[in-house]
């Protein structure tokens, strides 16, 4: 649930209702909060495309259609673009030109219930991290090995989770990732006006829904459980959706990770900033031994 949507909800009677339910019926409050947690926001900030439309493709997932686009030579190494919660594949199309111009192939897709893809098992306007991770795995299976994956926001969580389920990638780029969803439930509780009685029940409902502990999606802890290719983290210090400290925590935990920080780009404009695009493209293109890796947690 993005901070922008939480801000809108804060102004409504929903907050007063959650406060009452915390006292008299926390289980009902948790059910309401769960419904909000899995709801996809309306797309924000759609702009003109920076890249010409690619060649369309479709893959089947859960008996439904996931759509995407491909740019570049079919025989080239492939870079996958993964959008975040409420996003869409072409949201990351600023990376297409530099990468295809350097001889790489680029694949983007709309996750279930996002963009032009069919709704997933959760139904229209709803999704889970698992659906994003499964969509990435299905798209890679259909389009070939991943030279690199560039993922934004919650898409980074999905990409990291996919690594733990067998996805192989030569390099990873996480732009404005969330380090751990569990602390975010406390932020949601504070903004929506409910306390620990409701929040603990909300966490239990989320875990039952996805079939995994929320700790399974904590990126710093994943470093000890998954294959960790070289990782570039990019995060703005003024991001109000996911904090810069999230990327710093991931960088301290993942081997062969470095953090590139920006100022004033926020959570979405960072995807189109020329300096960020150049930094990411340079990382994706550099030979594995071309640049010495600094200790995890240092910044470029």
Question: What are the functions of these language-model segments?
Answer:
Residues 2-60:
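An N-terminal hydrophobic leader/cap segment in hydrolases
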Residues 89, 96-120:
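Conserved alpha/beta-hydrolase
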Residues 124-147:
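Alpha/beta-hydrolase active-site loop
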Residues 167-212:
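Hydrolase active-site cap/lid region
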Residues 226-227, 232-235, 239:
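Short beta-strand/loop motif that positions the catalytic acidic residue
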Residues 240-246:
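Conserved alpha/beta-hydrolase "acid-adjacent" motif
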Residues 265-275, 293, 297:
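Catalytic histidine-centered segment of alpha/beta-hydrolase-like enzymes
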Residues 271-286:
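Post-His helix in hydrolase/transferase enzymes
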